[in-house]
From Swiss-Prot:
Alphabetical list of InterPro entries matching this protein: SurE, SurE-like_Pase/nucleotidase, SurE-like_sf
Co-factor note (free text): Binds 1 divalent metal cation per subunit.
EC number from the UniProt entry: 3.1.3.5
Record family assignment: Belongs to the SurE nucleotidase family.
Catalytic reaction(s) noted: a ribonucleoside 5'-phosphate + H2O = a ribonucleoside + phosphate
Primary location recorded for the protein, binned into one broad class: cytoplasm
Gene3D superfamilies: Survival protein SurE-like phosphatase/nucleotidase (3.40.1210.10)
Chain positions recorded as a divalent metal cation binding sites: D8, D9, S39, N91
Keyword ATP-binding assigned: no
Protein species of origin: Thioalkalivibrio sulfidiphilus (strain HL-EbGR7)
Protein name: 5'-nucleotidase SurE
Domain of life: Bacteria
Enzyme class: hydrolase
NCBIfam families per the UniProt record, alphabetical: PRK00346.1-3, PRK00346.1-4, surE
Amino acid sequence: MRILLSNDDGVHAPGLQCLAAALRTVAEVHVVAPDRDRSGASNSLTLARPLRAMRLDNGDVRVDGTPTDCVHLAITGLMEEEPDMVISGINSGANMGDDVLYSGTVAAAMEGRFLGLPAIAVSINSHEGKHYDSAARAVLDLLKRLGHMPLPANTILNVNVPHLPWSEIQGVQATRLGHRHKSEPMIRSHDPRGRPIYWVGAAGPEQDAGPGTDFHAVRSGYVSVTPIQVDLTRYDAIDTVANWLRDEDPA
């Protein structure tokens, strides 16, 4: 198996390096990742300038672009043979609920799926970085399952792992995305010259986080595996919108 591995924390991030080492025990691994932290880059592509890629001494490739750039460049411009799968992570910090809309980790996996490949995004529910090995083991277990039963078409697995030793993980649950309240307000400050600057506020608190959600699974000590897709169409609303558009007198 040939795996393309990327992330949004940067090519030197310990989560990526831990996962690369684990994956190399079962597969041929090609690392193509951003040259720096690109958290929150979502699905953005670099269009206004060329991308530069540099191969490091260990064979990994760093790119001065976004996670989506990295996967797109690797598959369509760098790799001589197409990978069998794209994996993104291990991200430092969870990507659950509405967070997936902003996540560069999820976006890298999504780009792989968009280019026709099975894809997994994996994150750990902490920024401390003590238990990346638990997340790596969860990915290896998923790969074994995928060897017996491939993913349904157009499916990305968004995996979130509790920040626990593997011996304390309770199991694995299939989940849906939870939801948060809206984000906290922007934080206003001033630069050294007194000019206003703004920091993005913290994510909103959990709102829909009951049983069945990714939030609940991880909080309960389970690995959360959420199937997501590229197609954002809300099919159950098409007829409603069609009727709304046919209304000749909106008033």
